[in-house]
Every structure is written in structure tokens, then in C-alpha cells.
């Protein structure tokens, strides 16, 4: 195996691990701690900044030729803004989440006590066979919802899962 393949495999595996950690803006502590731990394993000193970022000095010999790399560790997300009468969820965006490019995406809902539920983000009336306005309907957070992969049909059903506003 070539060195470049070895690094490519490592980078791919680490990227997958990092992307599996829920990290919407303001909720990045877990991913920051993971990144810091991985840098420590590689022998680097990593520190968390006041704002929750990770700062790593990779060393070098000539500071006049220093390079700085800056990257985001947060992801786009949403926050529950309403539990609808049928138990489905309305969300508001966190970060640059846009309703136009999130339709039919899988979502993970994290409760305050750490339980995780999955679902899908979709148009309120997602049946193209019944909804005559499906194709023309403007996608916005006001007309889209999270349909949970759970047997819920009321607000109370959803609240019993630990999901709330």
C-alpha cells in the first residue's frame, strides 16, 4: 500500500467518524472532544478555545512560512419549534440549513437526556398522488415537518419519547 493510499484511508475513516457525531452549531462539545483526543493520539497538543473550537499547533521549523488551517466542526441542524397535533415536528434552522435542499433527508432528533430518534424531513403533505400542489409548493420550514420513525399519532405520544420544544 502506498503512503498516499494509507493517508487517504485514514482521512476517509476519520471523516466518517466525525460526521457521525451530532454537532449542530452550539452543540459541538462532543465532536470537539473527539477531534482533540485524536490529535493527542497523534502526539499533538490540542486545546479547546473559549468558543469551543479546537486549536492545534502542528509544529514546524520556519514560522515565517507558517500555514494556518481553519475548518468548521459544526454541522447544519434544526431545533424543534412545535410538536404538531399528529405528533410530527416543526423545526427552525440552526446555521445555514435551507428547506429547499433538505427535503427527504434523514434526521436524528436528540432529546435533552441524550436519547436519539430518527425520522425524515418532508413536506407536510408529501404524497405526490394526493397533493396536487406538490411540485409547485414552495419549500419552507412553515410547510415542512419531521416525520419520526416511531409510532406516534399525538403530541402526547411524541412527548412521552422525551421530545419537547
Label the predicted regions:
Residues 1-165:
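N-terminal hydrophobic/helix-forming segments and targeting peptides
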Amino acid at each position: 500500500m502506498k503512503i498516499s493510499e494509507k493517508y487517504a484511508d485514514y482521512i476517509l475513516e476519520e471523516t466518517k467518524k466525525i460526521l457521525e457525531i451530532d454537532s449542530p452549531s452550539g452543540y459541538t462539545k462532543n465532536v470537539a472532544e473527539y477531534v482533540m483526543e485524536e490529535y493527542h493520539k497523534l502526539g499533538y497538543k490540542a486545546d479547546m478555545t473559549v468558543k469551543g473550537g479546537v486549536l492545534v499547533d502542528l509544529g514546524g521549523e520556519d514560522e515565517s512560512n507558517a500555514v494556518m488551517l481553519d475548518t468548521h466542526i459544526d454541522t447544519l441542524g434544526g431545533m424543534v419549534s412545535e410538536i404538531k397535533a399528529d405528533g410530527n415536528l416543526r423545526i427552525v434552522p440552526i446555521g445555514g440549513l435551507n428547506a429547499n435542499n433538505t427535503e427527504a433527508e434523514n434526521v436524528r432528533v436528540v432529546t435533552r437526556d441524550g436519547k436519539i430518534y430518527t425520522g425524515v424531513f418532508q413536506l407536510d403533505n408529501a404524497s405526490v398522488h394526493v397533493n396536487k400542489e406538490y411540485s409547485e409548493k414552495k419549500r419552507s420550514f412553515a410547510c415542512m415537518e419531521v416525520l419520526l420513525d416511531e409510532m406516534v399519532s399525538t403530541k402526547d405520544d411524541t412527548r412521552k419519547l422525551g421530545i419537547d420544544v
